[in-house]
């Protein structure tokens, strides 16, 4: 036996242990679910490694998890004969949290137990859940293929440090003993443990066993002798792969528990789909849409993807090749009959079977969402609030399914008068005016900026609906979604408004006449502004505002420029078109000014006002304020 070493926990582990004990007290029994789940994973990993090295079984190929309790000592032990851990593995896995974005996770914690328990559940507490009920945890483990005297003893009271020493252990695998707190001794009761196992572990494909005490010889009711029975390890769960069972035999509760097993989430899934595909490819998939977004959904380093099984043998976690990035929130598994057992991530990358399965699974998920949107709008809104921004990546990523993805998108709109994104493109089309051929939209920094934009004035007057977009991803989305069901999406802040048949002949004639009458004024403004603008025009979109700026059809939009600048990308200079409203008093009075210096000042002031309204900021706000003060003083004399 080697000398004992003491190690300090990683800072994040200390935080997690403290938070878990104080936040998850209302759901203490999850410790057993987490530890049994880990033990089952260890069995799966050994089964996979043994495909290429049968000697790892060491003559014991019957994989199982065993749970026992000692009431007198107040202990619960969870033992598996899975892959086990080396000394380095123990220090790495039981002393640190090897997850990217961990610091960000802790920043999100509020100190409010109910909210934090949800976040901690999403984070995945795993092994550390033992400390919810245990005052001390002892782990004895030996890695498969290693000698008996290369086993490891790990022990901690969860306070800030743990000890590690080398021991001798005849059997491979891991044995975790929980020394229960005095107030948690109920978990040393056999019946309590059995009820938890039945609740949480039926779906696990590895047998979960508990010791069944034998009975002594005794007299029967009629005086006959009932022979003694020996104690034995009794299997407590169905121990079959849930996804291979008939759907009609699986309860909703079993589906939900299986979701929690594979996702390490402890909130229920929103919906799921269990499907067997037969034909050119044969595979089974069980797909879940979570009810809550994981805390690290936007972390670039976050692993995502499905669990991959081949002929019921676990191959890998996070097989991202079967799911496009815009559906990275989907949890679940795929079990293939066509892929080889020695399949690697590299082989999956360019495999025609993989590509066909990815296509089928993508369509399956989109179908799930379409059905949810049709059957339960309220539940779909719950989904959209959690994952809508991720789904918006779809049209740029998946050209083949662009129209289907577009049908699932939701936006705020001038029709609802609410910031809630509840309007689909189909809803919009169903309300289009007679003769309307375009879907009008605006992208701005916020809902209020979009809803109050002067660019909407004429459209509001004509009661034409406009989609209001204000998420950072919306400009990216709209660059890849130019039409839907043969209706062009048209920005109200770019190029001509193009109302087509929505503008009658009299309006067109009046607009042309106004432009003609205002030609001298337009030329004066052009001369005053010089190279600050690409052009100056009489507006066709304003009714109540003196002026606005628009970008050309082929130019980079204001929001795209902001995105590029935020990403540190070089941005070409884009000069706006300045549109003025001659019917507005400020512009009509501008026409009466004979002093060209004053005329230039007023023209510049109107331009900067319009730019401030459009961009929310100015390149040189000090110059604007100086000019504004100068104009105010001049008019106060």
Swiss-Prot record:
Subcellular location: Cytoplasm
Region named C: 563-637
Presence of the UniProt keyword Chloroplast in the record: no
Region ranges (B): 346-562
GO cellular component, one term: cytoplasm
Key words of the record: ATP-binding, Chaperone, Cytoplasm, Nucleotide-binding, Stress response
Span of the signal peptide: none
Predominant location category: cytoplasm
Keyword Cytoplasm attributed: yes
Domain of life: Bacteria
Region of interest (A), ranges: 1-345
Pfam families the record matches: HATPase_c_3, HSP90
InterPro entries: HATPase_C_sf (IPR036890), Heat_shock_protein_90_CS (IPR019805), HSP90_C (IPR037196), Hsp90_fam (IPR001404), Hsp90_N (IPR020575), Ribosomal_Su5_D2-typ_SF (IPR020568)
GO MF terms, alphabetically ordered: ATP binding; ATP hydrolysis activity; ATP-dependent protein folding chaperone; unfolded protein binding
Record-linked HAMAP family: HSP90
Family: Belongs to the heat shock protein 90 family.
Main function: Molecular chaperone. Has ATPase activity.
Protein name (database record): Chaperone protein HtpG
Organism of this sequence: Shewanella sp. (strain W3-18-1)
